Structure formats: C-alpha cells, structure tokens
C-alpha cells in the first residue's frame, strides 16, 4: 500500500485535514505492546482512534486508493462503526440483520468472544423459529468459522445437508474445507479437487490444502506442485495477479523448488510494471539458479 494507496493525493489531503497519522512497527519499540492492546491479527492494519484513544474502527488488509478513501470517509462520518451499529440495535432489539452486522464488526475488530455471543443469539433465534434458509445458515457457519469455532460451523453445514435445503452441495463443500482445517487432514479435499470441474472450488481447495501442507511442513514437494496448479488457475484479468505470482515465486525460492517455473511467473508479474519487491524476488531466484551475473544486473 505504501507504493500506491498511501501516496494517493486524495488520501494525503484527507489525512492532512482529518487525521494525525502515526506509523508503528508492531515488532519494535512500543509496537508489541500496542499490537496486544489493539488485538492486531494481520498486516497492514489501520486503526482509526478518537481523541481519547478509543478505537472507532479499523481497516485490515490491502485496499486500492478509491476503496481506502471511502472507508476513511465512512469511519469519519460514524457510519457502520461498532457504536453506530449498537445504537441502531438498541433502537431495534431483536433485529436479526443488525445482530449479524454487529457480529461481523466484532470479527473485524478481532473481538471473537463478543462476536460469538451474538452468533449464539442468532443461532438460537433460527432454531426456535424453525427458520432454516440456506443463506442465513450458511452465513452463520462462515462467521462461526471466522471466530475460531469450526466445529459449530461444521454442525450447521451438516444440518443444511441433513435437511436437504437448497444449495446443500455448497454446504457439503465448505464442510470439507472446515473439516480439513480442523482435522489437519487433506485426503478428502484432495479427492474432491481431482473430481470437480468448478474452478472457484478448485482454487479454494488448493489454498486450503496448501495452508495445511505449509503448516505441517512434511510434504513440501506436494505443496509446490499444488501451489503451481493454483496460480495457473488465474488469468491476467485477475487484478492482484502480480502479487499472487510474486508470492508463489518467493515461496518456491524459500523451498528451493520449481525455480524455473518461479522465474517464469515472476517475469509475467513484471509485465504489469516494475516493482522493487518483484525485482528482488527475481534476483533471488536467478541467484539460486546459479545465474549470478543476471541476478546482479537486476539488483543494479
């Protein structure tokens, strides 16, 4: 984001007029303490605090300039912040859609215990009112998984299948994903990915399997093989393709596997424009391939 979003003139102007901006390294100085205090779970995380240091909202992950600016304006206006949603819910007790929005906000703020409290209320409401609509139950399962309760998510997905609710095939697939993660076992998901012709499902399956293999670190050749298959499912229309290909190349460099393929992918990434991080990856791969002079040329 440093190279595009933070250098956008509109965002610089907004920050100048509305914010006091501080950049903190979460690994140095007061960073580790602030990381714990504000429950930072990923990078980049942009916290928007009021004058007393209370969190109004946060923006997690990469955002292109236009989207990032919209988020800043939304937070400044107090729209769909936690306090805004809580006020709306207080005025409309029992509104399930508001409960869902509060749950999602607590998840975004990395407060899983509070999120689960509202999730339990929604699940109880659905059960007591025999409200078994696929999208409602499916959304509920996704949220339970996000807050760290995959076993509840799996139970809900199994319920969709048992009741033969519309789109139960989707529930079956996500059940496979969650069970693979929970059991740390890729066998069923590997079988599924070999049978399905659904590209989206293949992508999701590959990424879940790759995460498990990377965590276990017991079959790096299979991880590399599946990583290549996964990135090959994306075409040049995918807006984050350069970043995806660079990530693949860096991982292959770490593993010391599929280096020629990694070089091919990093060259494709550079077709979208030169980027210092991607150039560094290319130099590293060339070096490991023994093409030292070419690596030095890239660095220079």
PLM regions and their residue ranges:
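Thiol-based oxidoreductase modules, predominantly thioredoxin-like and allied folds used
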Residues: 3-30, 48
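Non-catalytic, surface beta->alpha helical segment in thiol-disulfide oxidoreductase systems
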Residues: 41-81
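Charged, amphipathic alpha-helical linkers/stalks
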Residues: 70-118
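Register position in tetratricopeptide repeats
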Residues: 74, 78, 108, 146, ...
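Alpha-helical repeat scaffolds
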Residues: 82-88, 113-126, 149-163, 184-196, ...
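Generic helix N-cap/helix-start motif at coil->alpha-helix transitions
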Residues: 92-100, 128-139, 163-175, 198-209, ...
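Short, charge-rich amphipathic alpha-helical segments embedded
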Residues: 105-139, 145
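Alpha-helical adaptor scaffolds
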Residues: 142, 174-179, 207-218, 228-288
């Amino acid at each position: 984001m440093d190279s595009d979003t933070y250098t956008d003139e509109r965002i610089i102007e907004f920050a100048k007029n509305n914010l006091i901006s501080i950049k903190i390294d979460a690994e140095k100085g007061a960073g580790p303490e602030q990381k714990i205090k504000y429950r930072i779970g990923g990078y980049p995380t942009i916290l928007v605090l009021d004058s007393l240091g209370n969190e109004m909202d946060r923006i997690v992950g990469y955002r292109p300039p236009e989207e990032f600016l919209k988020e800043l304006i939304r937070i400044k206006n107090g729209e769909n912040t936690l306090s805004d949603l809580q006020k709306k819910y207080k005025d409309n007790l029992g509104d399930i859609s508001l409960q869902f929005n509060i749950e999602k906000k607590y998840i975004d703020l990395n407060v899983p215990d509070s999120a689960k409290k509202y999730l339990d209320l929604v699940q109880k409401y659905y059960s007591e009112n025999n409200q078994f609509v696929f999208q409602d139950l499916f959304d509920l399962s996704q949220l339970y998984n996000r807050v760290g309760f995959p076993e509840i998510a799996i139970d809900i997905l199994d319920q969709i299948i048992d009741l033969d609710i519309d789109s139960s095939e989707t529930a079956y697939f996500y059940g496979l994903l969650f069970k693979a993660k929970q059991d740390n076992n890729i066998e069923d998901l590997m079988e599924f990915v070999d049978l399905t012709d659904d590209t989206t499902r293949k992508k999701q399956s590959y990424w879940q399997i790759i995460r498990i293999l990377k965590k276990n670190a017991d079959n790096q050749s299979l991880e590399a093989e599946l990583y290549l298959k996964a990135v090959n499912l994306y075409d040049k229309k995918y807006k984050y393709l350069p970043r995806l290909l660079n990530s693949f190349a860096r991982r292959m460099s770490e593993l010391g596997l599929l280096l020629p393929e990694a070089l091919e992918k990093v060259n494709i990434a550079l077709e979208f424009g030169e980027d210092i991080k991607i150039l560094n990856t290319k130099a590293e791969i060339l070096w490991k391939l023994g093409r030292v002079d070419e690596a030095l040329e890239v660095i220079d």
